[in-house]
Amino acid sequence: MSLILRLASASLLVLMSGCANVSYYLQSVSGQLDIWRRERPVEGVIADPATSAALKQKLATVVRIRDFASRDLGLPDNRSYRSYADLERPFVVWNVFAAPEFSVQPVRWCFLFAGCVSYRGYFAKTDADRFAAELSGQGYEIHVGGVPAYSTLGYFADPVLNTFIHYPNAEIARLIFHELAHQVVYTRDDTVFNESFAVAVEIEGVKRWLARTGDERGRADFERRQRIRDEFTRLIEKHRERLEALYRTRIAPDAMRSCKAQILGELEQEYRALKQGWDGFTGYDRWFAHKPNNAQLASIAIYTQMVPAFQALLARERHELGRFYKAVRELARLPMEERTAALRALVPPSRTPE
C-alpha cells in the first residue's frame, strides 16, 4: 500500500470517529504514519552495508520465523513482518490500564474498528502518563505499561520493530506468532478472549518452531522462561481472585482497604520467595517497583485468564491448527456470555479461571 493510500486510510479513521476522541485518534494516526515513514523491506535492510552484522543475523532469523508462521502454523501469509522500522525508542506504544478502587475489572474504551478493549494505547509515554494522571484524579487505580508490538488486525502490514528485534529468537517468534494470531481470529469487545487465544497460539507455535530448528539451547531457555511466566501468572491470579472475593463482600470501605492492603502485601512477600527459585531472573521486579494495584493485576489477567481453556480446545482438536482455528472462529460468533461459558466448560473446575 502506498504512503498516500495509507495516509488516506488513516485520515478516514479520524473522520469516521466523529468529534469524540478526535485528539486520541489523531495521535494514533500520527504514530502510525511515523512507523510507515521509517519502515524498509527486511531484504533491503539485510543487504545494506550500513546494517550491523548483529541486526542482519536477527533479521535473517525473522525471515525464517515469518515463513514458518504461514507455512507450518497456518497464520496469514501477507506483508506483515516483512519490513523493519527503527523507532528509536524502547516501546512502540504505552498502554494505560485503569480499574476502580474496589474492583479488578478493568475500565474499557471503545474504538472504531477494534471495538471495546481493556486498555488505551499511546505512541508517546508523555501522552500515556497524562491520560493516566487524569484517570487517577478521577479516583481510578492506574497502570502504564510499555508494549514492544501491536497488531493492526490485518488492516495494514505490521513491521518488525527495533523494540523487540534484540529479544532471544524464541521470544521474537513468540511475539510474531501472537500478533499474527490476531489476524486469524479477533472478536470485538472481548479482550480476554482475543489475548488468551493469541497467547495459546504463541506458546504452541514456539514449541513447534524450536522442534523444527533443533535448537536445544533455545528450547531449554524457552521452557525456563515459560515456567517462570506460568508461576508468576498463577501467583497473580491467586491474589486477583482473593481481591475479587473481597470486593464482593459488603464490609465497610475502611475495612475493605485494610484487607486489600494485606492481600497486596502478601502478594509482594510471596513474589520475593517465589523468585528465589528462578536462578537469578528478576524480570518481574520492575512490575513490583510500584505498589501493585487492581489495574496492574487486571493487565496480567487480560492475557492469561483463558489460556488453559484454549489449550484444552487445541488438545480436543488433536493439535491440528486448522481445526483449532475453525473451532475458535465458531466460538467467536457466539454471544460473549455463551462464548465464555463454552470456554470454561473445556477445563476442569480446579483450572477454570475466575
Can you annotate each of these PLM segments?
Residues 32-69:
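Amphipathic alpha-helical packing elements
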Residues 21-23, 35-45, 103, 170, ...:
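Metalloprotease/metallohydrolase-associated module, dominated by Zn2+-dependent proteases
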Residues 17-18:
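C-terminal motif of bacterial Sec signal peptides marking the signal peptidase cleavage site
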Residues 65-229:
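Acidic/His-rich structured neighborhood in mature extracellular/periplasmic domains
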Residues 233-354:
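Pan-zinc metallopeptidase signature
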